Structures are given as C-alpha cells and as structure tokens.
C-alpha cells in the first residue's frame, strides 16, 4: 500500500510520465464543452430544419437560422424529418471526435484526414447556408430575379450562417480534444 501512495506522489521515480497539472484545466474545459455542445445541437437542428423543410415567413437572419420549434415541427412533419433533423448535430460531433482521434497520431495521412474533415464540414455548412440564403432570397425576390451562387457569396447572411456553424464546430473540436487530453492526464495512476 505504501508503494502505491509513493507511485502516486512521485510517478517519475517509477518511470511513469504523469503530468501533475491541476485537474482544474479538465473541469474548466468540460464546463466550456457542455454549453458549446448545446449550442451546436440547437444550431444544427434549427439550421437543417430551416434549410430543408421550413417555409419562410420572414427575412430575418435570426428567424432563418434559429427556428425555435424546429425539432417539434420536424416531428409533426413526419418521422423521417424528425430523424434527419435530430441526428444532424451528432454527425458534426462525430466529425469533431474524429478530429481528436486523427490528432493523436502525427502522420501525414492523419493530417490529410484532418484536412478532409475540415473541408467536408465546411462544404456542408456552405450547403446549409446556401439553402437558407436561397429561401430568404425567394421570400423577398422581385419578379424576374433569380438566385445564384454569386448572390449567396455576396450575402452577409450566407457568411453569418457559415461562421455560426463552422467556427463554433472548430472551437468545439478543439475544446473536445483539449478535454480528452486533460482527461487522460487527470489520473494516469490509479
């Protein structure tokens, strides 16, 4: 029993590489990760519902992105819509988890996979932003005007949607990676 206490107090004596930083970093990271996760869930449920199923009644960006009853409306629209809208946030969280896993190995292939994940996520956010911006455009369209990618790219709403999703997704992935790394350091010796 004395040996176990000694190992915990001086792990380097026994050849164990243990970080003695306080557990506070883990708990601070976790306390940041939880609300960011909730935000991502709300954002992607709302944005995906708005992009694929919502009929617009306003040109407000907030109303376009954040549909307060998106999940409830998707459920009432049908089980397929509910499953689609309800599971999209987990796709992004899964991609964030893969970011963490690919960062563990420092190989060229891992960096290529990381780049591919960022591009994939960014492209999906572009699709969501494009579809939402198109619905806003169609709502306020003047007869004879047609929506195009160049109109979307010039729209502040388009970029606002991308950054509200993609930038927060990147932050979530980095915080998640930090929390997972700190969790490994909390107690290497049990």
Give names to the regions the model predicted.
Residues 19-183:
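Hydrophobic alpha-helical transmembrane segments of integral membrane proteins
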């Amino acid at each position: 029993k004395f040996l176990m206490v000694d190992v915990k107090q001086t792990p380097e004596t026994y050849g164990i590489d243990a970080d003695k930083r306080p557990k506070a970093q883990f708990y601070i990271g976790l306390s940041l990760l939880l609300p960011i996760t909730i935000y991502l869930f709300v954002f992607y449920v709302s944005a995906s519902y708005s992009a694929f199923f919502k009929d617009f009644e306003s040109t407000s960006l907030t109303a376009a992105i954040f549909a307060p009853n998106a999940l409830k409306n998707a459920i009432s629209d049908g089980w397929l819509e509910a499953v689609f809208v309800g599971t999209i946030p987990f796709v992004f969280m899964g991609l964030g988890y893969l970011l963490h896993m690919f960062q563990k190995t420092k190989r060229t292939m891992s960096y290529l996979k990381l780049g591919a994940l960022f591009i994939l996520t960014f492209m999906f956010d572009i699709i969501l932003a494009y579809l939402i911006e198109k619905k806003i455009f169609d709502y306020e369209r003047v007869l004879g005007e047609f929506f195009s990618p160049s109109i979307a790219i010039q729209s502040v709403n388009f970029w606002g949607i991308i950054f509200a999703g993609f930038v927060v997704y990147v932050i979530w992935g980095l915080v998640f990676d930090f929390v997972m790394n700190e969790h490994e350091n909390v107690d290497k010796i049990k």
